């Protein structure tokens, strides 16, 4: 039985909404840097846009479309929700590590932690959708053979 559309929509919208927050926050951070209001490394802007906006939107949309294409349901909504937290924490940690006027030794743990969380989120996403695709296609193939 497919995952209810209400649940898929909720997960997708959570990713997309948060992604658009990053889309707006990134240019604000960049503008603050250009105007001298804040001293911010521009790498922080790119982290916000790539991981905060692009990755969040891609993750959210894939959780909506992949189950339908694979004739199944998301393997784990819980993993999708945990992943939402880890990608956000990783993006925020990496943005903070790259944005401040800190010495590299001070920001290194924050940077490594942020990258580790982003990587963990990507691995969770890949595993969750791989299981979704495999189980959905197996179920679909067995129904086709029975018909």
Describe the residue ranges of each PLM region.
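Hydrophobic alpha-helical transmembrane segments of multi-pass integral membrane proteins
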Residues: 1-147
């Amino acid at each position: 039985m497919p995952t209810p559309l209400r649940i898929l929509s909720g997960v997708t919208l959570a990713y997309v909404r948060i992604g658009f927050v990053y889309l707006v926050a990134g240019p604000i951070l960049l503008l603050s840097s250009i105007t001298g209001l804040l001293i911010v490394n521009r790498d922080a802007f790119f982290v916000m846009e790539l991981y905060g906006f692009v990755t969040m939107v891609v993750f959210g949309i894939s959780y909506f479309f992949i189950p339908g294409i694979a004739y199944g349901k998301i393997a784990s909504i819980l993993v999708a929700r945990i992943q939402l937290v880890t990608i956000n924490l990783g993006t925020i940690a990496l943005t903070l590590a790259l944005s401040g006027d800190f010495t590299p030794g001070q920001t290194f743990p924050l940077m490594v932690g942020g990258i580790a969380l982003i990587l963990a989120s990507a691995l969770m996403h890949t595993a969750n959708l791989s299981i979704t695709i495999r189980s959905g296609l197996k179920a679909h193939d067995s129904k086709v053979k029975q018909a």
